[in-house]
């Protein structure tokens, strides 16, 4: 290096550990329409000022590192750095704050949830200056969301494909989740679909195990689909789980499903990964397959209130990465989900424009600029007595999925499906007539049971079943 170059490079450089606040805490910054905005719930270590902690989050999730480096002078940090532009204390909590960070759009690769998450929720979550950190929400600007595939088809196209309108769709996860042979599995699928369900589902655990290889399962399920369609005159579907150990194997399974004439495949998007999910979404769009998404592993990431990623962020990421359905919890069943929080991210999945509403945990106004919506799937510990509440909470654009609530019927699988179909149609009719499902729900089910022995038997079996636990994640 020449002396002249050494002198020029040394101008303005001061080695040492950074005070993040000096560069990355910018309370006067006015956010741009193209910025990606993040709301972090942060718990600093004792003695760490919230401004320093928020600035550290902005730095470590964008251009910063722990010390000043020579190469800072070779780029424009003001153009590329994240900025902590606001900090507010969390009501009722000691030493806990919401830090708002703005990221310039050029930090992220177009159409890549993988790159987005690698930056925003990467190493910063292990930062020693923070006792805990949780990403509560993201604002995705239209300039960025338009670079993503989004759902392969969306709600309206799915309705048109199925020719089913004006009610929630009904599903069932085949149980036991592991251990059935392919032929017995196909039999259960046929009985449920013949009884009146719209969909049946592979459990997320079912891939290709020694007791049931994927190709055998696909073949027997396809036979069940065509037989039930011929008998009922309705279009039926089964979520064939294409999740596999490699992307190549996953796509091979999706190709086989399409060749069999199946209308929908499934993917475990968190365990499978966003890159695999987006690849599958592209295939599904190009080949007319619907894509059902299971969220296995989500509670490891989102259930703790102070650390991790809220599911509303994972839901937004899925809408961008691609999926036509995603599991969202039930509010009333066995799985975690408070009503207002759940409806907040359900709207973020389905609607085109969602206003900021802190009462539902929505930190930013989100404009999806006509990106297709995703059907929320309510699944987990639900049965016929829950039908009025589920219909009232989730509305028509949803899938209500009863596994044990179908297959646990005392008379068998088909009567279990009949009970659920009668219950949902009774609830929809009552709602359309102006009745209040929240207050009259049990009466509506009892009235319908007088004309359906299958529903009456289901009501008797599950009349005492409740899951009354407080939600861990609350506002």
UniProtKB/Swiss-Prot annotation:
Binding site for substrate: 123, 173, 177, 295, 327, 379
PROSITE patterns linked to this entry: RUBISCO_LARGE (PS00157)
Residues found modified as N6-carboxylysine: 201
Entry GO CC: chloroplast
Reaction(s) catalysed by this chain's protein: 2 (2R)-3-phosphoglycerate + 2 H(+) = D-ribulose 1,5-bisphosphate + CO2 + H2O; D-ribulose 1,5-bisphosphate + O2 = 2-phosphoglycolate + (2R)-3-phosphoglycerate + 2 H(+)
Required cofactor names: Mg(2+)
Gene3D superfamilies, sorted: Ribulose bisphosphate carboxylase, large subunit, C-terminal domain, RuBisCO large subunit, N-terminal domain
Cofactor note: Binds 1 Mg(2+) ion per subunit.
Pfam families linked: RuBisCO_large, RuBisCO_large_N
GO molecular function: magnesium ion binding; monooxygenase activity; ribulose-bisphosphate carboxylase activity
N-acetylproline PTM positions: 3
PTM sites of type N6,N6,N6-trimethyllysine: 14
Alphabetically ordered keywords of this record: Acetylation, Calvin cycle, Carbon dioxide fixation, Chloroplast, Disulfide bond, Lyase, Magnesium, Metal-binding, Methylation, Monooxygenase, Oxidoreductase, Photorespiration, Photosynthesis, Plastid
Posttranslational modification: The disulfide bond which can form in the large chain dimeric partners within the hexadecamer appears to be associated with oxidative stress and protein turnover.
GO biological process: photorespiration; reductive pentose-phosphate cycle
EC number: 4.1.1.39
Residues at the site labelled Transition state stabilizer: 334
Binding site for Mg(2+): 201, 203-204
Matches recorded under InterPro entries: RuBisCO, RuBisCo_large_chain_AS, RuBisCO_lsu_C, RuBisCO_lsu_C_sf, RuBisCO_lsu_fd_N, RuBisCO_lsu_N_sf, RuBisCO_lsuI
Leftover remarks: The basic functional RuBisCO is composed of a large chain homodimer in a 'head-to-tail' conformation. In form I RuBisCO this homodimer is arranged in a barrel-like tetramer with the small subunits forming a tetrameric 'cap' on each end of the 'barrel'.
UniProt function note: RuBisCO catalyzes two reactions: the carboxylation of D-ribulose 1,5-bisphosphate, the primary event in carbon dioxide fixation, as well as the oxidative fragmentation of the pentose substrate in the photorespiration process. Both reactions occur simultaneously and in competition at the same active site.
UniProt family annotation: Belongs to the RuBisCO large chain family. Type I subfamily.
Full protein name: Ribulose bisphosphate carboxylase large chain
Source organism of the structure: Equisetum arvense (Field horsetail)
């Amino acid at each position: 290096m020449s002396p002249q170059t050494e002198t020029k490079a040394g101008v303005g450089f001061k080695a040492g550990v950074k005070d993040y606040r000096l560069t990355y805490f910018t309370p006067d910054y006015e956010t741009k329409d193209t910025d990606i905005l993040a709301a972090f719930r942060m718990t600093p270590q004792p003695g760490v000022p919230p401004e320093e902690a928020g600035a550290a989050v902005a730095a470590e999730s964008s251009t910063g590192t722990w010390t000043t480096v020579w190469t800072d002078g070779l780029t424009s940090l003001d153009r590329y750095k994240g900025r902590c532009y606001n900090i507010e204390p969390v009501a009722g909590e000691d030493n806990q704050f919401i830090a708002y960070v703005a990221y310039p759009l050029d930090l992220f690769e177009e159409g890549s949830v993988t790159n987005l998450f690698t930056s925003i929720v990467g190493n910063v979550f292990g930062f020693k200056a923070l006792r805990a950190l949780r990403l509560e929400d993201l604002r995705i600007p239209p300039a960025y969301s338009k670079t993503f595939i989004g759902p392969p088809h969306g709600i309206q196209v799915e309705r048109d494909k199925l020719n089913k309108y004006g009610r929630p769709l009904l599903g069932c996860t085949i149980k036991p989740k592991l251990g059935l042979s392919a032929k017995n599995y196909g039999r259960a699928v046929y009985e449920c679909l013949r009884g009146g369900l719209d969909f049946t589902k592979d459990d997320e655990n079912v891939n290709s195990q020694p007791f049931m290889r994927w190709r055998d399962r696909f073949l027997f399920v396809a036979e069940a689909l065509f037989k039930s369609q011929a008998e009922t005159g309705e279009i039926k579907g089964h979520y064939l789980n294409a999740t596999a150990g490699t992307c190549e194997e996953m796509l091979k399974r999706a190709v086989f499903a399409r060749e069999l004439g199946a209308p929908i495949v499934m993917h475990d998007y968190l365990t499978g990964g966003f890159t695999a999910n987006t690849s599958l979404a592209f295939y599904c769009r190009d080949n007319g397959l619907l894509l059902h998404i299971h969220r296995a592993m989500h509670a490891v990431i989102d259930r703790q209130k102070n650390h991790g990623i809220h599911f509303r962020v994972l839901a937004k990421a899925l809408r961008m990465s691609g999926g036509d359905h995603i599991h969202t919890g039930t509010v009333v069943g066995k799985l975690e989900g408070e009503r207002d929080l759940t409806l907040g991210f359900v709207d973020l999945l389905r609607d085109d424009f969602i206003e900021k509403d802190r009462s539902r945990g929505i930190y930013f106004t989100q404009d999806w600029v006509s990106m297709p919506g995703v059907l929320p799937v309510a699944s987990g510990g639900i049965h016929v007595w829950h039908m009025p509440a589920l219909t009232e909470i989730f509305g028509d654009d949803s899938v209500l999925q009863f596994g044990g609530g179908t297959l646990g019927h005392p008379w068998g699988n088909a009567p279990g499906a009949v009970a659920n179909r009668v219950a949902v149609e009774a609830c929809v009719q009552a709602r359309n007539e102006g009745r209040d499902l929240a207050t009259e729900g049990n009466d509506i089910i009892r009235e319908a049971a007088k004309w359906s022995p299958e529903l009456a038997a289901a009501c008797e079996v599950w009349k005492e079943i409740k899951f009354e636990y407080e939600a861990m994640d609350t506002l």
